[in-house]
Amino acid sequence: MAYDLLLERFLRYAKINTRSDENATRTPTTQSQVDFALNILKPELEELGLSNIHYLESNGYLVATLPANDDRLTRKIGFISHMDTADFNAEGVSPQVIESYDGGIIPLGTSGYNLDPADFPNLQNYIGQTLITTDGTTLLGADDKSGIAEIMTALAHLKANPEIKHCEIRVGFGPDEEIGIGADKFDVDDFDVDFAYTVDGGPLGELQYETFSAAAAELIFHGRNVHPGTAKGQMVNALQLAIDFHNQLPAEDRPELTDGYQGFNHLQTMTGTVEEANSSYIIRDFETESFENRKATFQEIADKMNQAYGQTRVDLVIKDQYYNMRQVIEKDMMPVELAKEVMEDLGIVPVIEPIRGGTDGSKISFMGIPTPNIFAGGENMHGRYEFVSLQTMEKAVDVILGIVSKP
């Protein structure tokens, strides 16, 4: 159904730069996220009359409660969205609202960029709908300002319609999800729910309880620099070591060659000189055994290269980042089945697929709160071609309301 102020909320949130900073050491990593929580979201929660509204300086989460209004609905359910946006220009976001999209090319402001169905066939799913796009110079921030707007709108609808009976609802708006550390300090005891949902998915119907298991691999290659004219038998080129290491990884296990349940090894950066070079990889897989095998392959290649040179030419550090939340959620599929049933009741076809990435729910699930992910509507996220459908956002609100009112 249509909801007053949903579009207005989203546009207002989207215009605020809340980009996170992977190089910062504070929590949240940017002051703009703190300001967004305290100056925008907290007053709105207060105006809605929620209880126990508090901002946790320890982790950057803004938390609030809407008490149950029916003693028979005893569940305590959480909804979580993140405040930060991805690593793309977020200053001066100027959304475009395209009403009754006709299926054609959408110019992104005067930037010279276009949303073209020839490049983005997913646009054909939205003919006749209201689309919100960028002006071509920034991202949109539907990931995850759409989720925040949907949660806020659901709360406002429940407060305005007390005849709708619902369980206790806890909401959490957190920082730094896009750089993978948003849930590191999540306070499970403070949030105090039976289960939760991240409202951080993509198109209509997405319902996800599987993520990658993830690790980061950092390598330092140690060379020996001598004059190239007399280098024979003496020079060890650290850049060549980095290339040799990379070439020993399976060539087919790259992101651009994988999909579905296939994992990958992704070389993110390679820098250096003859004397020293650095490579950074991310390692991703869904299954524990193959995840461990991937990490073991990295170690085996490093060991083999060091053995061949008779000394340490390759230093390798691997750090696990998060794990497939399926390991937790599949022990009790009730949160997934509940969301699935609500979607079906609303005529929405659930699209249950693995997330080829991670969510805050990955870590929160392992902390003790099962937290699958539901759609928020964003498409082509993290860049200038990002867009979201107002009608999909409305249906996300419908799903939230259905979940909290389901007996």
Swiss-Prot record:
Binding site for Zn(2+) 2: D143, E178, H382
GO biological process, one term: peptide catabolic process
Active-site residues, record numbering mapped to chain: D84, E177 (proton acceptor)
Cofactor, free-text remark: Binds 2 Zn(2+) ions per subunit.
Keywords: Aminopeptidase, Cytoplasm, Hydrolase, Metal-binding, Metalloprotease, Protease, Zinc
Residues involved in Zn(2+) 1 binding: H82, D143, D200
Listed GO CC annotations: cytosol
Xref: Pfam families: M20_dimer, Peptidase_M20
HAMAP family reported in the protein's UniProt record: Aminopeptidase_M20 (MF_00550)
Name assigned to this protein: Peptidase T
